[in-house]
Amino acid sequence: MRKLTAVNSLLKRNNYLLPRHGSSQTAAQRTSSVRETETETKLPKMPPFNYSPPPYDGPSTAEIIAKRREFLSPALFHFYNTPLNIVEAKMQYVFDENGRRYLDAFGGIATVSCGHCHPEVVNSVVKQLKLINHSTILYLNHTISDFAEALVSTLPGDLKVVFFTNSGTEANELAMMMARLYTGCNDIVSLRNSYHGNAAATMGATAQSNWKFNVVQSGVHHAINPDPYRGIFGSDGEKYASDVHDLIQFGTSGQVAGFIGESIQGVGGIVELAPGYLPAAYDIVRKAGGVCIADEVQSGFARTGTHFWGFQSHGVIPDIVTMAKGIGNGIPLGAVVTTPEIAGVLSRRSYFNTFGGNPMCTAAGHAVLRVLHEEKLQENANLVGSHLKRRLTLLKNKYELIGDVRGRGLMLGVEFVKDRDLKTPAKAETLHLMDQMKEMGVLVGKGGFYGNVFRITPPLCFTLSDADFLVDVMDHAMSKM
């Protein structure tokens, strides 16, 4: 009786009519139809959130697209078949022009660390704006030195001197220049599949053809990528590091300026370096007179969960650390931190950055550090990220389309392949899944050289319920393929 009542209720709720006399539909077909309808109604449910945005009265998506095409660079591109018009954001959620809420699992490309519009960061910026937002570092202001002091307290060894920039590209440009000035050498080693920026020197260090223009990019040698999934030596980090030795011996004078590498490759598809690689590579480079640069633009600021800085999980201490993105929670800010000895090379000439270290940005950065500490977001990234990775791994066991699940904390990657043995990139399937997940309220990023990797880098306030919702949506979308 209860089953019949439930079926009748389902039929009524979906405006189904029982077949009239003479209908060709069989009882089995009717039961199948009910089951399909019941399945369709069981879409994953987004966790509750105590905020609703006010009505949006700005330009429509169509108007924005028209202006973008007319006035902005044609190099700009967007995700999704139907572009998303984001008009407001709170913590781990963003809202479109219709007030619809989405779970942001991309975090502005690993940039939103504390959460969208975190009140502590917003209040610090507003407070500073009411005092002074910019003058010049030629005058004194306590915000830049206060933030620098707090920042170096998170770093090991003799990493005690800070230079502020506006972006990760700027930070890496400065770091590479300092390495060359300090050593008196020009050659730098970076990794294949890496991304370090798109200016003159950093484009040379970047090693993906789809991010490189045909301009002069001299003095950089790209070593074999220590990729445990696609690499030729599997997870043997020391074997990969031998290529750094060979590059130095056969491609340079035997002396180099340095090595630059991400702790986890971000744009390259959330690739964790093979265990043992960085200690071996650092040792080889230092024996050749070079310094070691850790690019922490994406993996820094507690994102990997187990450590505040990504390089710490490899057991190394760099000579120079670069950072951006999560440092300001969306405010344009970057930095280079190095030793007093290396920092001294910039005193040979005048070095200046107009906006680097301005009061507003450094007030934001200082607030980010406070929030990360007070709200224990590193611990949260470890807890939620570990849970999310476990659930994604279970999903891999369910679907052949998933070739690899990797990463640490809330910096995770899911690589899609058409064939697990051949590892043929499933680029079209990746795009389709992204679109389907967006329709169900989940936003993820995309990366990897072949464009077949989900980049999952949400704000660090991401919850266990958010993680479950993401996986449930992904599971539902994949079940329909």
Swiss-Prot record:
Superkingdom of origin organism: Eukaryota
Cofactor: pyridoxal 5'-phosphate
GO biological-process terms attached to the record: cellular response to nitrogen levels; photorespiration
EC number(s) given by UniProt: 2.6.1.44
Assembly and interaction partners: Homotetramer.
The family this protein is said to belong to: Belongs to the class-III pyridoxal-phosphate-dependent aminotransferase family.
Name of the molecule in the record: Alanine--glyoxylate aminotransferase 2 homolog 3, mitochondrial
Native organism: Arabidopsis thaliana (Mouse-ear cress)
